[in-house]
């Protein structure tokens, strides 16, 4: 059996550059690991492959489930035939879904790391990355975490030096936002010329120079998202934004105490709020390290 943490992420800015011929969008974003995480348990056993979560029960074994896709793609990559079997995956969910925090992608990457260790520890890193890319745009980032710039449809990841740690108030509304819907709204409302072609100078010292192109179109349909971003700024956040395609928003603070004070100020009905912090590459590796139990 293997236990592994699956940390969430936030997007520090997200620029949509254009819509590609394959239907995906060309993007550029800074992805940052945070301490909030799910816990994934992988057990080798006889019988069919199962994927379940105590909070939702059995999960679908199809392309709507990134964890199942990881199991299936890795199974094929190591030369096995037929339907995957002999493994049970249990996911203890803490990361809100449809929130732009990358929970499903991080779970998939955690299962991939665990299964490589259990099934094929000598598998080449390039093949592991190929499996990650084939499953989802964000999955490659979660193989290593930390701070990185992601381009292409999000799968081209280049590691960056870790940012100075900051604390976050993450606010999650009672509704989720579909990634497909968010990009469809952008297609109808925006022009690629409106997006930045390069990261703004000095962004590491001034995160408020970064923008999320999707925030504005999503807030058109859900005004409360923009209102919560404003509340976080008023509460003292040095930078506040929606993450990914939403629906979660966050504010950055220099200390845990400041984040806790802000959390009390921005609480309101219909929103879940929590305090967490960013993770350096080393902290991500320590948190996401496999615990193997025979």
Question: What are the language-model segments listed below?
Answer:
Residues 108, 112-149:
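Contiguous, small/hydrophobic- and glycine-enriched helical/loop subdomains that border
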Residues 14, 38-42, 138-142, 148-149, ...:
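Short beta-strand scaffold segments in enzyme catalytic cores
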Residues 90-119, 137, 238-253:
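Glycine/serine-rich anion-binding loops at beta->alpha junctions
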Residues 29-31, 129, 139, 155-161:
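A generic local secondary-structure boundary/capping motif
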Residues 1-99, 117-126, 163, 172-175:
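ATP-binding N-lobe of GHMP and related small-molecule kinases
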Residues 47-60, 111, 133, 202-211, ...:
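Short, basic/glycine-rich phosphate-binding loops at helix/coil junctions
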Residues 142-239, 254-294:
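Conserved, helical-rich catalytic subdomain that frames metal- and/or nucleotide-binding sites
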């Amino acid at each position: 059996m293997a236990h592994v943490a699956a940390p969430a992420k936030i997007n520090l800015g997200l620029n949509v550059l254009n819509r590609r011929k394959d239907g995906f969008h060309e993007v550029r974003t800074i992805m940052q690991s945070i301490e909030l995480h799910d816990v994934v348990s992988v057990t080798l056993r006889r019988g069919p492959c199962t994927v379940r979560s105590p909070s939702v029960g059995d999960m679908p074994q199809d392309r709507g489930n990134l964890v199942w896709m990881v199991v299936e793609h890795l199974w094929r990559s190591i030369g096995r035939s037929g339907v995957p079997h002999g493994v049970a995956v249990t996911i203890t969910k803490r990361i809100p879904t449809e929130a732009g925090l990358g929970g499903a992608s991080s779970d998939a990457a955690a299962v991939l790391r665990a299964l490589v260790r259990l099934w094929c520890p000598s598998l080449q890193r390039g093949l592991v990355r190929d499996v990650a890319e084939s499953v989802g745009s964000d999955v490659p980032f979660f193989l290593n975490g930390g701070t990185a710039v992601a381009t292409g449809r999000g799968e081209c990841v280049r590691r960056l030096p870790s940012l100075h740690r900051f604390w976050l108030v993450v606010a999650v509304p009672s509704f989720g936002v579909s990634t497909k819907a968010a990009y469809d709204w952008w297609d109808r409302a925006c022009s690629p010329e409106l997006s930045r072609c390069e990261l703004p100078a000095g962004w590491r010292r001034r995160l408020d120079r970064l923008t999320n192109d999707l925030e504005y179109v999503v807030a058109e349909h859900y005004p409360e998202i923009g209102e919560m971003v404003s509340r976080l700024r008023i509460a003292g956040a040095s930078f506040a934004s929606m993450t990914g395609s939403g629906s979660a928003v966050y504010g950055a603070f220099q200390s845990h105490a400041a984040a806790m004070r802000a959390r009390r100020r921005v609480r309101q009905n219909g929103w879940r709020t929590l305090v967490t912090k960013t993770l350096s590459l080393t902290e991500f590796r320590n948190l996401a390290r496999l615990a193997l139990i025979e």
